[in-house]
Amino acid sequence: MNIYEYQAMALLNERGVSVVPGYMAANVEEAVKAAEQLSSPPYVIKSQILAGGRGKGYFRESPKEGGGVRLVSDIAAVKKQAESMLGRHLVTAQTDDQGIPVEKLLITEAVSIAREFYLSLLVDRQTGRVTFVASPEGGMDIETVAKEKPEAIHRIAIDPATGFQPHHGRMIGFALGLSGDVFKQGIKLAASLYKAFTTSDMSLLEINPLVETNDGKLLPVDAKISFDDNALFRHPDIAALGEAGASDPLEQEARQAGLSYIKLDGSIGCMVNGAGLAMGTMDIIQLHGEMPANFLDVGGGASKEKVAAAFRIILSDPSVKGILVNIFGGIMRCDILAEGIIAAARELDITVPLVVRLEGNNVNEGKAALVSSGLPIITASDLGDAAQKIVAAIRQTA
């Protein structure tokens, strides 16, 4: 689960990390009020979308007016810029060419920057450890730095048996090139970030840029946080952040139903159990010349209610021209799942082509139930067969 920058900054502040003062605004009046609450101009207006590259982005409706992050000199300019940003679609290197609508802004104080750094924490799958990634060269061009100057990227893994220790903080300070009092601030900041990361079950905590101000303070100016969806049950307050800030109502509905759903740009809706199987299904759809419309994992113990919810979510996307169900019945019985598919197909009156591939526990009974249902459900013997059939079906109906 991802959250917006304004939520990330507030969460870090609650966990003892000093951040640049700022307030969220959902309309022009709130933007003006937010600026009035800050100490003094200049101000920074930051578009709140769940994508990076905002500073170098542009608004689809007004590509020459400026990017998604703007520096303004007074409150009158806050009002003018908020009017030109809210409700428009911000296009960045991480969005499609349609962009993402900006529904919220973060108004912050501007800081005088002496140096910019990059600092993040993530779960390193190769080492199985929480790892700091640090670079003395932060800011909007960090991707270029990583590509052209990999020696400027430093990784510090934390042994879970010992946790964060003072020497880790010193290693991070040296990696960033800090000195003097700012070095001490860096050690304290790293310890606070590690504690926030581990106690909140984060999967990514990225500070870019982390800045040293002209008056010698070390402050996060921007923060990106992702959480482990499987641990959200331990953090209802954090789960509420995702529900309040969800940019896609279908993703919010899926989360509430216990489903993992991500909307994509294709035309074939996918319903699969297991993330690995889901990715394999999406790959083979592309291999046969079409694109998946979504990633949807119903999990290992999908009930009839979950299956029905999954179909509702998939069919709510008008770009879906056909549906491929690919289920391996291990814990889940294929005959029970088939009953759920049949019930959902009847309840929702599915009119797009539906191909179902079942394998595993009680697979023969499941296939028999689908065939005898009287519904236009196309069964498949394996994943390749399923992909061929759904691609052929949507092209035939096009």
Curated annotation (Swiss-Prot):
State the free-text cofactor note.
Binds 1 Mg(2+) ion per subunit.
Q: Which GO terms describe its cellular component?
A: cytosol; succinate-CoA ligase complex
Its EC number(s): 6.2.1.5
Q: What does this protein do?
A: Succinyl-CoA synthetase functions in the citric acid cycle (TCA), coupling the hydrolysis of succinyl-CoA to the synthesis of either ATP or GTP and thus represents the only step of substrate-level phosphorylation in the TCA. The beta subunit provides nucleotide specificity of the enzyme and binds the substrate succinate, while the binding sites for coenzyme A and phosphate are found in the alpha subunit.
Classification via InterPro entries = ATP-grasp, ATP-grasp_succ-CoA_synth-type, ATP_grasp_subdomain_1, Succ-CoA_synthase_bsu_CS, SUCC_ACL_C, Succ_CoA_ligase-like_bsu, Succinyl-CoA_synth-like
Q: What is this protein called?
A: Succinate--CoA ligase [ADP-forming] subunit beta
Q: At which positions is substrate bound?
A: N273, G330, I331, M332
Query: Does the record bear Transferase in its keywords?
Result: no
Write down the chemical reaction(s) this protein catalyses. succinate + ATP + CoA = succinyl-CoA + ADP + phosphate; GTP + succinate + CoA = succinyl-CoA + GDP + phosphate
What is the required cofactor set for this protein? Mg(2+)
Binding residue positions for Mg(2+): N208, D222
Q: Name one Pfam family in it.
A: ATP-grasp_2
Which pathway does the protein contribute to?
Carbohydrate metabolism; tricarboxylic acid cycle; succinate from succinyl-CoA (ligase route): step 1/1
Alphabetically, which GO biological process terms does the record hold? succinyl-CoA metabolic process; tricarboxylic acid cycle
The protein's matches in HAMAP family, at most eight in alphabetical order, are given as: Succ_CoA_beta (MF_00558)
Q: Which UniProt keywords apply?
A: ATP-binding, Ligase, Magnesium, Metal-binding, Nucleotide-binding, Tricarboxylic acid cycle
Signal sequence span is: none
GO MF assignments:
ATP binding; magnesium ion binding; succinate-CoA ligase (ADP-forming) activity; succinate-CoA ligase (GDP-forming) activity
Under NCBIfam families, the record lists:
PRK00696.1, sucCoAbeta
Quaternary structure, from the entry: Heterotetramer of two alpha and two beta subunits.
